[in-house]
């Protein structure tokens, strides 16, 4: 699973996800992409589950690019532990995803296979998504 090799600090504040994506909202690598339509924290496990679903549907043909990286440590305290005594330990890593962010890109497979693969990948994610293509992206930003 994805996680940073090294961080400046071990724990972070929770933070909020305000506004739309300031970058990463256009297709840069593949012909098809999966775009987030709402703000959410996506865990490393969810990213990996979506990646596996996409590659399985593509039957290991073509190429998949993961455009989000889980760099936010999420902490938690064990069950039935009293409040206080400091912040809990890091339990998992998450990525903050803004609306409009391209999360996955694929290329090298037919149109129907690409759309089905991204649909199955989207089912593993906790956000509403939209499948975008190179043609759609060109029309949007023209």
Swiss-Prot record:
Taken from the UniProt entry, a GO cellular component term is:
cytosolic large ribosomal subunit
Any one Gene Ontology BP term:
translation
Q: Which domain of life is it from?
A: Bacteria
Show the CDD domains listed in the entry: Ribosomal_L16_L10e
Give GO MF terms, alphabetically.
Answer: rRNA binding; structural constituent of ribosome; tRNA binding
Q: Which InterPro entries match?
A: Ribosomal_uL16, Ribosomal_uL16_bact-type, Ribosomal_uL16_CS, Ribosomal_uL16_dom, Ribosomal_uL16_sf
Q: Which PROSITE patterns does UniProt cross-reference here?
A: RIBOSOMAL_L16_1, RIBOSOMAL_L16_2
Keywords assigned by UniProt, alphabetized:
Ribonucleoprotein, Ribosomal protein, RNA-binding, rRNA-binding, tRNA-binding
Query: What does this chain do?
Result: Binds 23S rRNA and is also seen to make contacts with the A and possibly P site tRNAs.
NCBIfam families the record matches: rplP_bact
**Subunit record text:** Part of the 50S ribosomal subunit.
Task: Return the similarity comment.
Answer: Belongs to the universal ribosomal protein uL16 family.
Q: What is this protein called?
A: Large ribosomal subunit protein uL16
- Species for this entry: Phenylobacterium zucineum (strain HLK1)
């Amino acid at each position: 699973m994805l996680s940073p090799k090294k961080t400046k600090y071990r724990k972070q504040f929770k933070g909020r996800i305000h506004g739309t994506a300031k970058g990463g909202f256009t297709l840069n690598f593949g012909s098809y992409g999966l775009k987030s339509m709402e703000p959410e924290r996506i865990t490393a496990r969810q990213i990996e589950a979506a990646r596996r679903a996409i590659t399985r549907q593509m039957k290991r043909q073509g190429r998949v690019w993961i455009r989000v990286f889980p760099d936010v440590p999420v902490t938690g305290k064990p069950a039935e532990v009293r409040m206080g005594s400091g912040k809990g330990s890091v339990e998992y890593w998450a990525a903050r995803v803004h609306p409009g962010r391209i999360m996955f890109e694929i290329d090298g497979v037919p149109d129907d296979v690409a759309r089905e693969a991204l649909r199955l990948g989207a089912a593993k994610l906790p956000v509403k998504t939209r499948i975008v293509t190179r043609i759609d992206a060109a029309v949007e930003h023209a």
